[in-house]
A protein has these predicted regions:
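Fold-independent oxyanion-binding glycine-rich loops
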Residues: 8, 37-39, 59-60, 69, ...
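Short, small-residue alpha-helix embedded
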Residues: 64-87
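Glycine/charged-rich beta-loop-alpha catalytic/anionic-binding loops adjacent to active sites
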Residues: 52-62
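Phosphate-handling active-site elements
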Residues: 55-56, 80-94
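Charged C-terminal helix
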Residues: 88-130
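Glycine-rich beta-alpha junction loops
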Residues: 1, 38-42, 60-63, 94-98
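Conserved phosphate/ATP/ADP-binding segment of small-molecule kinases
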Residues: 1-54, 88
Length: 130
């Protein structure tokens, strides 16, 4: 999608960290900050962000695909930003949560039903003193 926004032909070739960062940097011509997700980084899958907070986040690629993980990533990212985290920390939190949700989903689970993230929801709520 990022390559389409930049009017390029989409490619699935693996990127290195510098190319991932450059892709995010180029998107700041269209918006003040940007996060590009689903980047193939060799044995990792990652995201890169640009704007006032530049970063590359990598997680070990898990060879399973589920619908809804992009929506889950976005929800955790926004929630983490609302909690006051920097964009780089929010992106890392979201990537880690999605990775854990994929790992938490039984191998025999029909992928059409998405990942089992519900047991992990307490990880998203900071402890509070009442």
């Amino acid at each position: 999608e990022a390559q389409l926004l930049l009017q390029r032909t989409p490619v699935d070739d693996p990127l290195d960290d510098a190319a991932a960062q450059a892709l995010a940097d180029e998107l700041t011509a269209l918006a003040p900050s940007a996060v590009v997700t689903g980047l193939p980084l060799g044995k990792y899958i990652g995201c890169a962000g640009s704007g006032s907070d530049r970063f590359v986040v990598k997680k070990l690629h898990i060879d399973r695909s589920f619908p809804g993980t992009g929506d889950l990533y976005g929800a955790v990212l926004i929630g983490s930003l609302i909690q006051g985290n920097a964009l780089s920390a929010a992106a890392d939190n979201a990537a880690e949560f999605v990775s854990l949700a994929i790992q938490n989903t039984p191998a025999e689970q029909d992928t059409r039903f998405g990942v089992w993230f519900e047991p992990l929801l307490p990880r998203l709520c900071p402890p509070r003193d009442f």
